[in-house]
Amino acid sequence: MSLPMLQVALDNQTMDSAYETTRLIAEEVDIIEVGTILCVGEGVRAVRDLKALYPHKIVLADAKIADAGKILSRMCFEANADWVTVICCADINTAKGALDVAKEFNGDVQIELTGYWTWEQAQQWRDAGIQQVVYHRSRDAQAAGVAWGEADITAIKRLSDMGFKVTVTGGLALEDLPLFKGIPIHVFIAGRSIRDAASPVEAARQFKRSIAELWG
């Protein structure tokens, strides 16, 4: 089983704020995510600027595309994104359109599982050639005190068994990682637990050490 990658989510409102994080920890992570909040705040220039600074890193545009899949994904890929996200409630043709464009750029598409989705949809995504999904505990659910549970683990295992590369996100803390041991997680996303730590560098390194211990 290969080691899960570590992704930092830049859900900052401005580039200046995002740079405060990347200056410290860009070299400690595998993937730099231009979060939805930053995408809205700064547009695709955030993707372009971060990829220019860190060309050796995977840069994800978390656009959560809901419609106009070809147009929006092309905007992201032309800004040099490596991956883009499509929201799970989008029509299957939106996901297919985004994937078609991704292939032109040797990029990839992730389906963001935020909110309601079905296993029938999951099979449609697989049939369409989608390889990546993001299992997401929403920010609002976290705020309401919803913790990771057995239902989450069961769903993640099922998605993996279907052949998806699964990314896990949603207020992920270091102590949560053992919950996923034994599952071939593709990526773990940490946002505030790294960005807001007393030492973001040490927080990122602790995540990497724990991943190596649990999956190595």
Swiss-Prot record:
Q: Which UniProt keywords apply?
A: Carbohydrate metabolism, Decarboxylase, Lyase, Magnesium, Metal-binding
Reactions performed catalytically:
3-dehydro-L-gulonate 6-phosphate + H(+) = L-xylulose 5-phosphate + CO2
Q: Which cofactor does it need?
A: Mg(2+)
Gene Ontology terms describing biological process: 'de novo' pyrimidine nucleobase biosynthetic process; L-ascorbic acid catabolic process
State the free-text cofactor note.
Binds 1 Mg(2+) ion per subunit.
UniProt: Mg(2+) binding residues: E33, D62
Share what the entry says about its subunit structure, partners included: Homodimer.
Entry-linked HAMAP family: UlaD
Name of the protein this chain belongs to: 3-keto-L-gulonate-6-phosphate decarboxylase UlaD
Organism for this UniProt entry: Escherichia coli O139:H28 (strain E24377A / ETEC)
